[in-house]
C-alpha cells in the first residue's frame, strides 16, 4: 500500500481552512477560503432587512464554497493523487445551527423565506436568545432537572435549545416549516454524504443530550412551551453517533466538486475546539487545551463526571473515547484585541506602525512587552462579548479600571491581554476546586502562533507551563485524524483516535514557563480581578445590565419615532 493522506477542514468564524495531512501528521498543503458573506450582523444579504442587536448569522452557501475551493486547491498544491486520499473530516464552530426542510435545503435559500432572519444560519456568537436561555434555566432549576449541573448550572443562549425557542417565539412559521434543526457541521456532512447523522460532541455539549439519559424529558420541554413537547423526536431526530465514526462516503456529485473519488470515507462532524485536543496529541487527563482565536475554548479530560461552576459541559466520550470531556470558554479574546485596534487606537499609532512596516497589533505588543506586571496601573474585565465561563451571562459587558490622563494605548492593550489571562485563570481555578486536575496547558489557534507576550502572560497568570501546537491549523489536523479513524486500519488509517493522536499530534519544542516574580505580582492583580468579577458579575451591582437595557430601549424608541 502506497503513502496515504487525509483531509481535515476547519470551519471557523470568518473562513474555512482545508489541510492535507499524511498519516504521520505532516501537513502537505493547506488553503484558507474566506466566507464571501462573512458574519452577517447588520443587514440580511440581498435585502434591507435590519438585524437587531446581538444577532450573528451566516450564509450556508459559504460552507459549500469552502469544499469547492479549498479541497481542490490543496490537491493541486500538493500534487497528491485523489486515489491516495482515504478520508475527509470536518470541524465547525458550535453551536452554529440552521433550519432545513425535508430535503435538507436551508430555509434561507428558499425565496419565500429569504427576508426572514430566523431562516438563516445562526452563528455560535448569536446572543439574541438570552431571554429564552434565562427562562430555560429558571424552569430547569425549579424542576430540579438533573442535566443542569452538568452544564455548570446554566444553559447558554449560544446553544441549540435557546436558539430554537427564539425561532418559535419570534417566527413560528419558520419553526413550523423546519423539518430539522441541524448543527452546521452535521449539515455539511449531510451535503457530502447524503446521510443525516448527528455527532455526539455537539449533541452533548450544545443540545443537552446525555449518553446515558438522552435528551431532557418531554415534560421539561412542555414546561418550557407546549409547542416544544415533541421537539427531540421530531425536529431534533436522527441518529447520534460517536466521534471517529464513519458518517458515510462522498457522493458522486460532491466528489466531483471537491476533486476526490466517490466513496471516500467521511467522518462524522466535530466541534472546532474539541478536534484540537487530539491535534496537539492530548489523550489523557490533566492537560488543558486552549483553542485560542476570536474566543477561547478550554478542553480537559477527566476519569469521572464532576460538576464545575460555569463549565459549558461535561460529556462522556465527548472529546476522547473512554474519558469525560470537560469544556469551558471565554466569549471574546482575539475579538477584544481586534476591537481595540479597530476602534480605540489613535491615529498616531497606526501611522507609526505603518512607518515601521508592522501591524498595529505588533506595534502595541512590542511596546506593551516593555512593561512589568502591575506597571500599567490598569485592570480590566474581559466581558466585551459577555461571559461564557464561569458566569454564563451574555448581558455582562467590558470594564477597564485605572485610566489617567497619562494612560497610553500600549498600556490599555496590555491590560486587555492580562484580562483574558485572568479569565482563563478563573476557569482553571473552578476545575481544580471541583476535583478536576490541571497540571499543564496546551495552546493552539491563531493567537499562540504569533503573540509571545500573550502566552508569557498566560503562563505567569496561571503559574503553569504552556506548550504550543506545532500546527497553525490544529483543529483541521484533529479533524484529519478523525478522518483517518473513519477510513479504518484496513484502508491505511488508524483503529482509534488515541492511536491517531500518538502518531500525528505535534507540539513545538519551545514552551512558555512561568517567571516567579511575575507570578507573584499577577497573584495580587488576580485577587483584585476576582473582586471586580464577583461585584459586577454575581448580582451585587447589575449596572452593566441596566446600561445595556437602557441602550436597547432608547435605540428601539428612537427607531420607532423615525417611522413617524
UniProtKB/Swiss-Prot annotation:
Signal peptide positions (record): none
Keyword vocabulary terms for this entry: Arabinose catabolism, ATP-binding, Carbohydrate metabolism, Kinase, Nucleotide-binding, Transferase
Keyword Transferase: yes
Pathway annotation from the record: Carbohydrate degradation; L-arabinose degradation via L-ribulose; D-xylulose 5-phosphate from L-arabinose (bacterial route): step 2/3
Chemical reaction(s) catalysed: D-ribulose + ATP = D-ribulose 5-phosphate + ADP + H(+); L-ribulose + ATP = L-ribulose 5-phosphate + ADP + H(+)
MF terms (GO), sorted A to Z: ATP binding; D-ribulokinase activity; ribulokinase activity
Gene Ontology annotations for the cellular component aspect, listed alphabetically: cytoplasm
Top EC class of this enzyme: transferase
InterPro entries: ATPase_NBD, Carb_kinase_FGGY, FGGY_C, FGGY_N, Ribulokinase
Sequence similarity: Belongs to the ribulokinase family.
Name by which UniProt lists this protein: Ribulokinase
Source species: Geobacillus stearothermophilus
Source species taxonomy: Bacteria, Bacillati, Bacillota, Bacilli, Bacillales
Gene that specifies this protein: araB
